[in-house]
Amino acid sequence: MAALAAIFDLDGTLLDTLGDLTAAVNYALGELSCPRRTREEVRSFIGNGVPTLLRRSLPAGADEEMHRQAMALFSAYYGENMTKTTAPYPGIPWLLERLSEDGIRLGVVSNKKHDATQPLCRRFFGALLGCALGARDDSERKPNPSM
């Protein structure tokens, strides 16, 4: 039986977002007078959404107030700068076009906030994706099957 649909993750699968994520992490850390993180450190901290990324990026012993401030700073910066260096990985647009031409419905499910997932998918993949779902405060996150 041929596949009817294909669902992809966004960060690190379809899009290389590491540069913009690193810049946003380091902006927040700098504003809080914390040491900056390297690109490789940020790469190792990614997984399970931005709150976890920032917990891993903040210095040991950072309290919840510092985490809250880092979240606000990161979100504001990333919202304005999330496409500075972000781009599809080589071959991804071609792959999605071929799958779509073969009648396979395409979608994205991401732990990235929904308000960031939507514009990134529209900008880089346009009408190729039938749906793009990101994390919301009132819903489960991947890998929960209900997402």
Which stretches of residues belong to each language-model region?
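Helix-loop "lid/cap" segments that line or gate small-molecule binding pockets
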Residues: 28-29, 49-64, 120
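Active-site neighborhood of HAD-like aspartate-dependent phosphohydrolases
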Residues: 1-44, 55
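Metal-dependent phosphoesterase signature
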Residues: 55-94
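Short alpha-helical
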Residues: 20, 49-52, 94, 115-116
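Catalytic-core regions built around general acid/base machinery
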Residues: 91-104
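Substrate-recognition "cap/lid" segment bordering the active-site pocket of phosphatases
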Residues: 84-87, 107, 113-147
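Core-facing hydrophobic residues within beta-strands of well-ordered domains
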Residues: 3, 96, 128-130
